[in-house]
Structures are given as structure tokens and as C-alpha cells.
Amino acid sequence: MTTSRTLRLLVVSALATLSGLGTPVAHAVSPPPIDERWLPESALPAPPRPTVQREVCTEVTAESGRAFGRAERSAQLADLDQVWRLTRGAGQRVAVIDTGVARHRRLPKVVAGGDYVFTGDGTADCDAHGTLVAGIIAAAPDAQSDNFSGVAPDVTLISIRQSSSKFAPVGDPSSTGVGDVDTMAKAVRTAADLGASVINISSIACVPAAAAPDDRALGAALAYAVDVKNAVIVAAAGNTGGAAQCPPQAPGVTRDSVTVAVSPAWYDDYVLTVGSVNAQGEPSAFTLAGPWVDVAATGEAVTSLSPFGDGTVNRLGGQHGSIPISGTSYAAPVVSGLAALIRARFPTLTARQVMQRIESTAHHPPAGWDPLVGNGTVDALAAVSSDSIPQAGTATSDPAPVAVPVPRRSTPGPSDRRALHTAFAGAAICLLALMATLATASRRLRPGRNGIAGD
């Protein structure tokens, strides 16, 4: 990618108090070097060990009397009708690596990509998260029902269930949640091998900078997907606030003051990381700042598809009532849909050129780049209309979902690494949705030592 993106990978943690984690010592942070020897082998998706469902499925609801529409969700998509005169994403395959994508009448083209959670094919979704993400990418319009639609309704989706907060390993009653950086790496390899031109990842591992994770397999898989298979990879930046979210990071964070490391976002040369803004284009209060944030899209009070029916929903149920569906998880699929539109419109562009185009056509903040919105809020019409590829905006810094500390490790061999990831696998994927108010969910989604965040 650009030199500025490469430079943003070199970050130094500053002294900061992280809730429950003490004050980390400042030291340099960067992802492990890409080593193709860590690339997962091609294999049929399957859980690393037997699992069982331990939690009831997530409740989703539609607010009574509310009219759903595109305009309420994202100002940057207000020109979708004009965009669709140029492209609707036909011919593109977008992989959703998430909690599964349920079959829905408004998602007519879903390919079962496999299941790392249970014994399914990837098209079950007990958490609701993956289906919400998929709807934002590709929901077909239905003018007789509402004004909601996905960004790229003609794409084919590849559903890979990689994580769930509702399942747990058999024989481990203290563990809740499945999904880790190893299964994420395998899922990325699978998505690339299934021909995905765009891969959406709305989950992350979020850790103190002093405890950077050993995610070499994931790094190798990301490099394989981008450099070998020419896939665009889009990831959520992550959320702060509440026990089930990432530790906060200063809004003005620079590469010299990072306290929270995020994977896969810190592989900035391979991942387009997306922060969240509100309907007015202002950074969401929950969006996690970081020197690897590239662009932003609307992620507040979104509407999408129900995994348990044939309608649309806009609220998540919880112990204390329902809450709006919000989070950087739902900003990322806006950008994934846009990437698919660009790839359909300009099929000769490489993955890196598509990522650069999205950054270059965004509405840049006053400084050209900042840690909350990166190069700015995406502009779908500009991205698919311009024949030229402008230079990326000025970048000086670089972000992911629910917080999970990962202990620093020495350099283990593959067998040692598998053992260490056994504990990591027991951590819940913290759905990037802003669900901090759900007390029981917060306890479930924030493991004691390790985990992957999501929303």
C-alpha cells in the first residue's frame, strides 16, 4: 500500500491506565512479520473441537411505527440510486466472516462457506450479528415493504460462521463463546479460496499494546488473500465503552501514543479499517481511535435484516429492554459493499487500488487524516464515478471490537501455539454492536484472559 500506511504500523504505547489492566510500560508495537509458513492449510471448515449451544439466541425487534429507509442510515449512501445506474455489484463475491448469515428472502444469493462454530454450513446465525452485517452489504430492495436496501444488492454472499457468543466448547462449563485468531485465519484462507473479491471482518482481537497477540497465522492469511487471491479485506475499527468493549484510546492518538493493539486492523498494509460516524458525519462516541483507521461510514442506529424472519429490524433485545443497533461492525459492511461496487465497475483494479480509491474519494477531515475517521467518510458516488485514481489523503496514524487481554508470549512452535490458543478459543467474540448496556451479555462477551471482539 502507500508509504504513509506502512509508516502507521510503527506505533509506541504510552503510559495509560487500562481498566483492570494496570499501567502498561511504553514500548514499540507492530504486527508480526508476514511469514507464509504460518498460512493455514486448505481444509474444509469445522470447529477445532466439539461445541454446544449454551445461550439463547439474540433477540431482534423492529421499532413500532418507524419507517425504514436508506437516508436514515447513512448520508454517504444518499446517492445510491445514481450509483446503481453505474453498478450494483453484479459478479462480485463478498465473504462475510462472522456469526453466520441466515437465509432470508432479501438475500437471494448466499453461498454456504462453512462453519467453524458448530456442525452447520455457515447459514445459521444465533447471534444475529452476521445477518445484520450481510443485510447492510447486499439486501435486495423491496419497495412494497420499506425503503431499506443493501449497498450492493447484486453481489453473491459467502457466509462463513467463524464465531459465536452463544456456543461454547463441550466439557468446559466455565467457557462461553467460540472463535479465535486461528479460526479467523482459517476463515480468511477459506474465503479467499472460494473466490471472494471482498472479505468483511466485523470482529477483532483487542488487547493492551503491551500484550500484543501472536496472530502470525492471521497475518499470513491476510497477505495470502490480498497478494495471492487479490481480495479486498475490510475490518471494523472496534468500540469503546462498557465492560464488553475495547479499552479507550485517546481520540488524538498518534503512532507514538497507542495503548490498544487491534488485530486484524494493525495489519494496515492488508486491511481497510473502518470507524463509525453518525448521520451527521460526526465520529461516533463509541468508535475506537487508532493509527490504522483508514475511513469511516455510518454505524449508528442502523436497520438491517432479521435472522429469524423475513422482515427488517433496528433494535437488539436485552435484559433491560431493546437498544438501537449501532457499532463499527455495521460501518464496515457499508465499505465492503462499496468495495464490491468498485470492483464490478472497474474490474481491472487490484485489491490495493480499490482500497486506495475508497480512501482517496472519501470526504477528508480538516487535517487530511485523523485517528477516529481516518481519511474521512466514504463517498460511494465519487468512488464509482471517477475514472482516475486520486492519491490517498494525508495519513499520520492508524484500530477493533470488545476488549480481550491476550498474554504476551515468547516465540512458540506450532504445537505450543495451538495449546495457547485453546484458551483463546474459549473467549466470546464480542459483537461489535454497541451492546454495553446489556449486563449479562457484557459478562459473557468479556473473557478473563483472551478473546475476539466483534461489533
UniProtKB/Swiss-Prot annotation:
Where is this gene product found? Cell membrane
What topology in the membrane does the UniProt record assign?
A: Single-pass membrane protein
Against Gene3D superfamilies, the record matches this protein to: Peptidase S8/S53 domain
Q: Can you name a GO cellular component term? A: plasma membrane
Q: Chief subcellular site?
A: membrane
Q: Where is the signal peptide?
A: 1-25
Spell out the molecular function terms from Gene Ontology: serine-type endopeptidase activity
Keyword check for Transferase, yes or no. Answer: no
Keywords carried by this UniProt record: Cell membrane, Hydrolase, Membrane, Protease, Serine protease, Signal, Transmembrane, Transmembrane helix
Which example biological process does GO assign this protein? Answer: protein processing
- What EC number(s) would the UniProt record show? 3.4.21.-
- What are the boundaries of the region Disordered? 389-417
The residue ranges of the Peptidase S8 domain are 74-384
Q: One short Pfam family name for this protein?
A: Peptidase_S8
The transmembrane residues are 432-452
**Could you tell me which InterPro entries the record lists for this protein?**
Peptidase_S8/S53_dom, Peptidase_S8/S53_dom_sf, Peptidase_S8_Asp-AS, Peptidase_S8_His-AS, Peptidase_S8_Ser-AS, Peptidase_S8_subtilisin-rel, T7SS_pept_S8A_mycosin
Say yes or no: keyword Acetylation present: no
Enzyme active site = D98, H129, S329
Q: Which family does it belong to?
A: Belongs to the peptidase S8 family.
- State the name under which the record lists this protein: Mycosin-4
The uppermost taxa in this organism's lineage are: Bacteria, Bacillati, Actinomycetota, Actinomycetes, Mycobacteriales
Q: Which gene encodes it?
A: mycP4
